[in-house]
């Protein structure tokens, strides 16, 4: 169970860093938002899901 928690935390951190870099780049590009809107929403949905997963796994471990 601890390994699953650690992997979920790592995935959350990695997703956060990717979104931290990619979202401003998408907004700064001239036609970025209209062409990459689905990618940003998918990344945000993944991030929210990982937040809940880490919370659930944390409650099971401690």
From Swiss-Prot:
InterPro entries: PSII_PsbZ, PSII_PsbZ_sf. Keywords: Chloroplast, Membrane, Photosynthesis, Photosystem II, Plastid, Reaction center, Thylakoid, Transmembrane, Transmembrane helix. It is a multi-pass membrane protein. It holds the Pfam family Ycf9. It comes from the Eukaryota. It is found in: Plastid, Chloroplast thylakoid membrane. The chain crosses the membrane at residues 8-28, 41-61. GO terms for cellular component: chloroplast thylakoid membrane; photosystem II reaction center. Belongs to the PsbZ family. May control the interaction of photosystem II (PSII) cores with the light-harvesting antenna, regulates electron flow through the 2 photosystem reaction centers. PSII is a light-driven water plastoquinone oxidoreductase, using light energy to abstract electrons from H(2)O, generating a proton gradient subsequently used for ATP formation. This is Photosystem II reaction center protein Z. It comes from Eucalyptus globulus subsp. globulus (Tasmanian blue gum). The lineage of its organism: Eukaryota, Viridiplantae, Streptophyta, Embryophyta, Tracheophyta.
């Amino acid at each position: 169970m601890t390994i699953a928690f650690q992997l979920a935390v790592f995935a959350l951190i990695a997703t956060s860093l990717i979104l931290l870099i990619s979202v401003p780049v998408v907004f700064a590009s001239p036609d970025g938002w209209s062409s990459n809107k689905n990618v940003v929403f998918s990344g945000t949905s993944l991030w929210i899901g990982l937040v809940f997963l880490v919370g659930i796994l944390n409650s099971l471990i401690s």
